[in-house]
Amino acid sequence: MEFIKGYFSRNKKLILISLAILLVFFFIGAIVSNVLVGENQGMISRMMIETNKSINFSDITVDAMSLFTHNLFVDLMVFIAGILFSIISVIIVIFNAISIGAPFGSDFYFASVSILPHFFFEYVGGSVFALTGAFLITKLEITAIKKRSIKESLSDPYVLKDILFTLILMVIFLLVAAIIESYVTPMITLMAFGK
C-alpha cells in the first residue's frame, strides 16, 4: 500500500500531463467535429432510431478478448515508444483523443450511449497510463544519457518498479474496459436504440 501511495506521489506530474494531453485533444476533437457537422448534428442517433427494428444484441456485441488485444497493442505501442523520447507516444494519444472526441461533437447522445460506458477505463485509464509509462521510459533514458551510464540511471530503486506498475495499471484498466465494451455497452446501446 505504501508503494502505491508513493507511486502516485512520485508520478503525479506525469499522470496529470498525460491526462491533460488526452482531455485537451478530446475536447478539440469534439469542438471541431461539432463545427464541421453543422446541421447534421445527431444524425447517427436518428439513423439508429429509424433502423431500430433490425438491431439485435448479437449485431452489436464484440468479443472482449479481441477488444482487449487491440487496445493492448495500441497502448503498448504508446508505452514502448517512450524509447523514442515519447514523441510518437504523444502523437498516437493525440490522434486517439481527437478521434474519440469527434463522435461526442457530432452526436453527443450516440457517443454517450456507445462510448461513455467504457470511456473512463479505456481512455482515462489505459491511454493515460500508457503515456505515463512512455514518459517514465523517456525519463529513464534521459537520466542514462545525462549520467552516461545505464547502470547509474537504474540506481533509483523505484524506476523499474514504477514502469512495471504503470504497465500493470494500464493492462488492468484495458481489461475492465474490454469487458464493459463487450458486455455492458451493447446492452445500453440496445436499450437506447434497439427493440
List each language-model region with its residue ranges.
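Terminal transmembrane helical module of multi-pass membrane proteins
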Residues: 138-195
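Interfacial helix-start motif at the membrane-water boundary
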Residues: 54-85
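Interfacial/capping segments of alpha-helical transmembrane domains
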Residues: 31-53, 188
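N-terminal signal-anchor transmembrane alpha helix
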Residues: 8-41
